[in-house]
């Protein structure tokens, strides 16, 4: 920060206002809504975005999520288990779409600290227009969960747009779904017109 201030002070940009901020802490994603929050709080010379900073209390409140992907872009998110093949399959899928169709394609892969057995998230976008959204997907048209235990740990279904599709890999029949699916998941599926499918991919 001090190096930047010193460099600008001795240039034609000496009257440019400079802010000091922290982002990406703990490998947190930086979203368009957080960037807008920075511009909306230019009276503050220091800030933190992406986390609740209870040490310096410099966190900025962010508004509703902002979607910058072109209209007609399909957003997909896949929740997998480290080394279960989900990431590899999605890398192949997005390459096939990019190489063999007239669509633009983009993929990001998010992991926790464990190499094997940890949570993996694959974020895939594809569509007819160029995609310049350099952040992870927070509202998806399609969400797939490849590990049934995740439905009790993560808010996956809530990441879907109204009318989106949720695919769950599980061995449960209707009775099992009634027993294992959390109440808030059932309520969200019903209230937001989510198309829900199951597949037993481990059978």
Task: Go through each PLM region and give its residues.
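Peripheral docking tails and interdomain loops at the edges
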Residues: 2-69, 184-187, 198-203
């Amino acid at each position: 920060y001090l190096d930047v201030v010193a460099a600008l002070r001795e240039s034609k940009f000496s009257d440019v206002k400079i802010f000091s901020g922290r982002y990406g802490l703990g490998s947190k994603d930086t979203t368009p809504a957080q960037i807008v929050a920075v511009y909306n709080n230019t009276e503050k010379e220091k800030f933190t975005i992406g986390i609740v900073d209870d040490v310096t209390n410099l966190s900025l409140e962010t508004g509703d999520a902002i979607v910058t992907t072109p209209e007609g872009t399909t957003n997909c998110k896949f929740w997998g288990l480290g080394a279960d093949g989900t990431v590899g399959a999605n890398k192949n899928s997005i390459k096939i779409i990019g190489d063999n169709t007239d669509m633009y394609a983009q993929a990001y892969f998010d992991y926790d600290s464990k190499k094997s057995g940890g949570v993996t998230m694959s974020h895939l976008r594809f569509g007819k227009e160029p995609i310049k959204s350099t952040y992870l997907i927070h509202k998806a048209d399609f969400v797939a969960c490849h590990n049934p235990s995740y439905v009790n740990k993560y808010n996956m279904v809530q990441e879907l747009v109204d009318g989106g599709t949720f695919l769950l890999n599980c061995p449960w029949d209707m009775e099992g779904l009634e027993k294992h699916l959390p109440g808030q998941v059932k309520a969200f599926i019903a209230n937001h017109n989510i198309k829900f499918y199951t597949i037993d991919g481990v059978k």
